[in-house]
Regions:
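Cystatin/cathelin-like cysteine-protease inhibitor module
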Residues: 21-138
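Bacterial N-terminal signal peptides that target proteins for export
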Residues: 1-9
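C-terminal motif of bacterial Sec signal peptides marking the signal peptidase cleavage site
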Residues: 17-19
């Protein structure tokens, strides 16, 4: 009788553990190529946090997000062109940057090569020229 009781208890515990094993509903996978609807604000926030002097930016331009090959994957990318100042308040000259998006959010904004942004269709980006949201702003 005792053996039967132990076997029954083990069976109940096993069923309980199987129920907790995570084989239930799975979280839906995130779509890596959701259109970045808020791309301009994400660029502004990133530039605020990465530029030595995020004030008085001039000649700012941005391209529309476009799906492009990024390594083995396709991702939404934008190109940003601007002339910003260094820590000594001297303009550094116009630079192109490329921004990579994952699931609709900017994950990387780095200097671009001519191959990456040389043929980008830029549009004026006045919001970047008016930028002053950081502790660095004077």
């Amino acid at each position: 009788m005792r053996v039967a009781g132990n076997a029954c208890l083990l069976s109940v515990l096993a069923v309980g553990l199987i129920g907790c094993s995570g084989s239930g509903s799975k979280q839906p996978e995130e779509n890596p190529n959701i259109f970045p609807a808020d791309y301009k604000n994400e660029i502004l926030l990133t530039m605020t946090n990465t530029l030595e002097d995020p004030t008085n930016i001039r000649d700012a331009f941005v391209s529309e997000p476009a799906l492009r090959q990024a390594g083995k994957e396709q991702r939404y990318v934008v190109c940003v062109r601007s002339d910003s100042r260094n820590a000594n308040k001297h303009y550094t000259g116009s630079k192109d940057r490329i921004g990579y998006f994952y699931a609709g959010h900017l994950t990387q904004l780095v200097e671009a090569s001519k191959e990456q942004c040389g043929s980008a269709a830029y549009k004026p980006f006045p919001e970047l020229e008016k930028l002053c949201q950081a502790k660095k702003c004077i």
